[in-house]
Amino acid sequence: MKEPTIENFLAFEREHKCNQIEIEGMHVWALYRYEIHNAIKAETVGRTEGDAQGFTKSELIRMAINALKPFTYKNVDVLFIGNGRRTKNADTGIYEDIYCDEIAKKYNSVILEHPENHGHCTPNGMDNVYFTDRVAFQTNLAVKLLKKFNTKKRQQRTAAVTEKIGPILDAIKTEFGPDLREKLIPDIVDRMYYIDITKKYCGKILDKANPKLIIEICYYAMESYAMSMLGHERGIHTAEYSHGFAFPTHTPMQYNPEDHLTELPDDELI
């Protein structure tokens, strides 16, 4: 069996052309590859990064309250897709996004910030930080309902994922060891719905913000995937501030050079 190193994972993706697998216009492997690699590592070396936990009832209520705030920013120059990871400044006590706060002050801009660890640190008083709790609330609720009622569309998507991704998961079992079919197929179907809902939400934001440039802090966030797709559709340039390359084993920051996908930004600002 092979070890689940990033080099072996990239070689596996290249051999099986994983990132080119497309269902309903979505490159479904690419949208879930971080979690796939994490699942392999969890079953083999027992180590993962960034495992997501479900939202509690109180967290969902708080998100719903945050979601009531309307989006009022129009015709901005730069739209930042923040990652919600604010660091407390020991001198000022203010929680700062070290990757985009300062540069955002220099432009007519807005920072979209999704919940981090199911919440938000108090931002730094800037009036251009907008919480995207509405789409996080919508996606969590929608996916729970879709799982419960197992609609015809979900059944069709499950069949498509089983057909196209199932053989790749079998190959993972052969090369890396773990059998991930039962766990990952429904999770990948869930991800398709997350993208559906997030893309619709982000489209409404773009209608108002009408940015000249979109800068993503973490391209593997749902809003970043959706904004990259929309940017390609609408002719809006997208770029990622690739701070993550400081961690060369961190799966999402590594792609094979030949993988040019609509879900990825146009440029990397390293």
Which residues does each predicted region cover?
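Catalytic-core helical/loop segments in enzymes performing group transfer/polymerization on anionic/lipid-linked
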Residues: M1-I270
